[in-house]
Amino acid sequence: MIRKSKKITKKRGSRTCGYGEAKKHRGAGHRGGRGNAGHQKHKWLSVCKFNPDYFGKYGFNRNPCLIKQLETINIGELEEYILKYKDAFQVEEGKVVVNATEIGFEKVLGKGRISTAMVVKAVEFSEGAKEKIEAAGGEFVEL
């Protein structure tokens, strides 16, 4: 069993309890303010030495209207969509013709499995989507 008395118990009766002069223990004046106070004034040298990149700007934020965000759909979801709304799509030469932009999607991604032969028209295709469409006996057309 550890028998160690607390520091404050040891310091009792020594008037300042280990804080030196009495006024050093009042508020945050003895340490020059709390936290990061004074980092552009009297603590500036410590900023220069230990954290020189704290102040100032670097890098940039790209204008959001310039960022191209495409609406995407996975090839597995596209097949489910086709099976759900069969009457909305045309069939040419045994292949279902799907225009992804008319449904509201610009890019076709390759997640999922397909068994239906289809002609898919979209702005962009991922490599996986191209492989899976051709493996199922279909074709892709980039608009």
UniProtKB/Swiss-Prot annotation:
The record, for Pfam families, names: Ribosomal_L27A
The record ties this protein, via SUPFAM superfamilies, to:
Ribosomal proteins L15p and L18e (SSF52080)
Record bears the keyword RNA-binding = yes
Q: Which residues cross the membrane?
A: none
Presence of the UniProt keyword Glycoprotein in the record: no
GO molecular-function terms, A-Z: rRNA binding; structural constituent of ribosome
Reading the lineage from the top rank, the first entry is Archaea
Against HAMAP family, the record matches this protein to: Ribosomal_uL15
Q: Which family does it belong to?
A: Belongs to the universal ribosomal protein uL15 family.
Q: Which PANTHER family match?
A: 60S RIBOSOMAL PROTEIN L27A, LARGE RIBOSOMAL SUBUNIT PROTEIN UL15
Task: Outline what the protein does.
Answer: Binds to the 23S rRNA.
Q: What is this protein called?
A: Large ribosomal subunit protein uL15
- List the source organism: Methanococcus maripaludis (strain DSM 14266 / JCM 13030 / NBRC 101832 / S2 / LL)
